[in-house]
Amino acid sequence: MLVLTRTNGQAIKIGNEGEITVTVLEVRGNQVRMGIDAPKHIAVHREEIYQRIQEEKPKAPPILEEVE
C-alpha cells in the first residue's frame, strides 16, 4: 500500500493519464473530507457501499462436471 501525506487543498492523481484526482477538502478531528474527480465510467463508492454491492451480486451457479 502506498501511503501519502496531503494537507487541505492538496491532491493526488491516479492513473497513467492522471484521470482520477483525489483532493483533501477538509480535515476535522479524525475525519477527512475528500473530493474525487473521476471519469463517468469509473464507479466511486465508500467501502461499506461497495461491500453491499458485492454481496448483492447474483452468485454464479456451480459448474457441473460432465459424466460419460
Curated annotation (Swiss-Prot):
Quaternary context: Homodimer; the beta-strands of each monomer intercalate to form a hydrophobic core, while the alpha-helices form wings that extend away from the core.
| SUPFAM superfamilies from the UniProt entry | CsrA-like
Organism listed in the record: Coxiella burnetii (strain RSA 493 / Nine Mile phase I)
**Which family is annotated?**
Belongs to the CsrA/RsmA family.
Record GO terms (molecular function): mRNA 5'-UTR binding
Q: What is this protein called?
A: Translational regulator CsrA 1
As for subcellular location, the record says: Cytoplasm
Q: Which GO terms describe its cellular component?
A: cytosol
Taxonomic lineage is:
Bacteria, Pseudomonadati, Pseudomonadota, Gammaproteobacteria, Legionellales
From what superkingdom does this record's organism come?
Bacteria
What are the protein's UniProt keywords?
Activator, Cytoplasm, Repressor, RNA-binding, Translation regulation
What gene name is given for the protein in this entry?
csrA1
Chain's role: A key translational regulator that binds mRNA to regulate translation initiation and/or mRNA stability. Mediates global changes in gene expression, shifting from rapid growth to stress survival by linking envelope stress, the stringent response and the catabolite repression systems. Usually binds in the 5'-UTR; binding at or near the Shine-Dalgarno sequence prevents ribosome-binding, repressing translation, binding elsewhere in the 5'-UTR can activate translation and/or stabilize the mRNA. Its function is antagonized by small RNA(s).
Instruction: Tell me yes or no: is Transferase among this UniProt entry's keywords.
Output: no
Where mainly found?
cytoplasm
One GO biological process term: negative regulation of translational initiation
